[in-house]
From Swiss-Prot:
One of its GO terms (molecular function) is ATP binding. It catalyses: tRNA(Pro) + L-proline + ATP = L-prolyl-tRNA(Pro) + AMP + diphosphate. This is Proline--tRNA ligase. Its main location: cytoplasm. Its EC number is 6.1.1.15. Catalyzes the attachment of proline to tRNA(Pro) in a two-step reaction: proline is first activated by ATP to form Pro-AMP and then transferred to the acceptor end of tRNA(Pro). As ProRS can inadvertently accommodate and process non-cognate amino acids such as alanine and cysteine, to avoid such errors it has two additional distinct editing activities against alanine. One activity is designated as 'pretransfer' editing and involves the tRNA(Pro)-independent hydrolysis of activated Ala-AMP. Homodimer. Pfam families: HGTP_anticodon (PF03129), tRNA-synt_2b (PF00587), tRNA_edit (PF04073).
Amino acid sequence: MKQSKMLIPTLREMPSDAQVISHALMVRAGYVRQVSAGIYAYLPLANRTIEKFKTIMRQEFEKIGAVEMLAPALLTADLWRESGRYETYGEDLYKLKNRDQSDFILGPTHEETFTTLVRDAVKSYKQLPLNLYQIQSKYRDEKRPRNGLLRTREFIMKDGYSFHKDYEDLDVTYEDYRKAYEAIFTRAGLDFKGIIGDGGAMGGKDSQEFMAVTPNRTDLNRWLVLDKTIPSIDDIPEDVLEEIKVELSAWLVSGEDTIAYSTESSYAANLEMATNEYKPSTKAATFEEVTRVETPNCKSIDEVAGFLSIDENQTIKTLLFIADEQPVVALLVGNDQVNDVKLKNYLAADFLEPASEEQAKEIFGAGFGSLGPVNLPDSVKIIADRKVQDLANAVSGANQDGYHFTGVNPERDFTAEYVDIREVKEGEISPDGKGTLKFARGIEIGHIFKLGTRYSDSMGANILDENGRSNPIVMGCYGIGVSRILSAVIEQHARLFVNKTPKGAYRFAWGINFPEELAPFDVHLITVNVKDQESQDLTEKIEADLMLKGYEVLTDDRNERVGSKFSDSDLIGLPIRVTVGKKASEGIVEVKIKASGDTIEVHADNLIETLEILTKK
């Protein structure tokens, strides 16, 4: 493909509105352009990468018997009313009316549609399992689109749905998808973790998220690609290294979620679901009496602990929530933070939100900072983190402004349900006892759910079993954010290319090192002087030879300065660069492997053999 025929509008500078490096580079390198807020056009390079990722998915899904189809994006609202999600999905749902004033939506996901199609076609267990998927644009009315393709109003998604006679059958397909996802993301060159996830609005029973790990900004060996003029990072002057560090830190660490993972095992979970090893501790032998003490102007845990000269871990934090219109008290030790998702899941609540101080005063008779679990009405449910049960002679609010209780003991002074509702901390022991927990930012790229009968129950999707009894179909749901894969790949494969000029000045510039399977082309063939006939002839020969061997070639035939061509090449990020330059008359070209920065001169007749050795193909 001739570059002069392609739409690749590269920019000389980073876009001013970009905050994450993936957004900046995909715009600057000419992969995408924003049409309006949260809506992007995928230009030829991006489209080629996305199509390659689709090919990987199709190949892996075929192995597990998943069949591709295509459902409409424009959906009748009646289907969503049938499932109950039309009212509960929230403001992200695009709602519209046709000329007859009938209600429609633009689909953000397609559980209802697939359930209806299968409900109307499948009547017996003998017709199951069914494993269907589609690759399609989805729509969500994001309040604040941001970070390029990571938070958009229109996005490309692979959503799959499986249908089963029972949970045992679902478990088999769920495991097939888990392995397929691992194969897909591995082939795509992504550093990812499969983590314990939250079903959220999808209504899942069990779920696993797949997160692309966002690299930190401190490892220079990971970020820098050195030109042949620079032997190693140690040869870069300290002042230049400081400039590089400033440039790296200027970009936000991308990722909407924090991952907690073990340093020594495969354990990994979204921070919302992460837990740690818990071993009950021994309580004090003697319990003190509850005593009310004055704590003037002390509202925070730190203030109370300081005033009473005690360790903060000897205090009970009392929080008030409203869960489905009912008050719920959450108790934690000291400065532990409540994990809203854990609490909501334990309560099986549809809605959970912190109570207002006015509500607290109505229930407790006191404001925030003086709340406690002692002498609460029986109608108030108390959920305590499991660490609270290990406390003895603790301090809690006295439900009177300006006062606290000392000598508070669980079970004797209050009754609670004990469960893990705290947010884990970095450095704590992994729940499997292997290694400690570390945190990283992550981009969600996939999610699999065991939906169970959530949709088949509400929509009447039933089958007759072996005994002629009618049972709801058991479902699974499997999503991959196809368009955000482009962001994740660029986030992980962005690099700073560093070189030294003939005068000894150091230069560095951003670019991409695409993994081979997702690169829009395999080889960037650059002609330094397009007006030189020998160069042109050699370029055409090399292009033909490469294509004959199955290489996809982008040939830069533009009449541009060589510096501009090399700059664009670094931005575009193809794995191999072949330059036809000053030695064209001798048949010699320069080959550069982008990932390592290694360069070598070879004769054109030996180019294919050399590439096979260098790329280990």
